[in-house]
């Protein structure tokens, strides 16, 4: 979520902005997909940085479809989609509007994707119609693989108070979450590559 009390900065491998996230991943032995502004070789990107469970930086996806709005016109578009083997699951990653285009699902399917993670700031309605229709299209075009949408909430920067996080499979929405900032947990069979949950397990951040 955007923080009005924090100055906007771009992460890089040369500064320490990712350090606290890397330390948390190491401490809890969890992988993190972190939506953030990122700068590499003096080129700013709207990215999803991937941090490994041992606390090291792994890789990143740079958003390919940069919209010409004030919220994003600072970023240069990425050029490619990659699929990484993460804990035995071939995983594709996208940022927000990347998920709108069926051909992007086809690109990760061609590379053997079994799961997709999308970090987003995508309120309901707006440009391009309901976001869930784009997410369904993405899942279908990627051979029906499970898609996890991690969406922004809150009202800072823009109104995402009704934005939904979601899990999809075979081109259909399985379940969603809408509300305050929370930790959302699902049960996933990493061998059969199946979503076992029928709803999110929700932990409100105020309860932590």
Regions found by a protein language model. Give the residues of each.
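Hydrophobic residues at beta-strand termini and immediately following loops
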Residues: 61, 84, 150, 177, ...
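Short, conserved active-site loops that position catalytic residues or coordinate cofactors/metal ions
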Residues: 1-11, 118-120
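Short secondary-structure transition/capping motifs
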Residues: 10-14, 40
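Short beta-strand-to-loop element that shapes/binds the nucleotide-sugar donor at the catalytic cleft/hinge
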Residues: 34-39
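CN hydrolase (nitrilase-like) catalytic-core segments centered on the catalytic cysteine
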Residues: 13-33, 100-183
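Active-site catalytic loop in hydrolytic enzyme cores
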Residues: 40-111, 124-137, 161, 190-208
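Exposed aromatic-hydrophobic patches
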Residues: 184-190
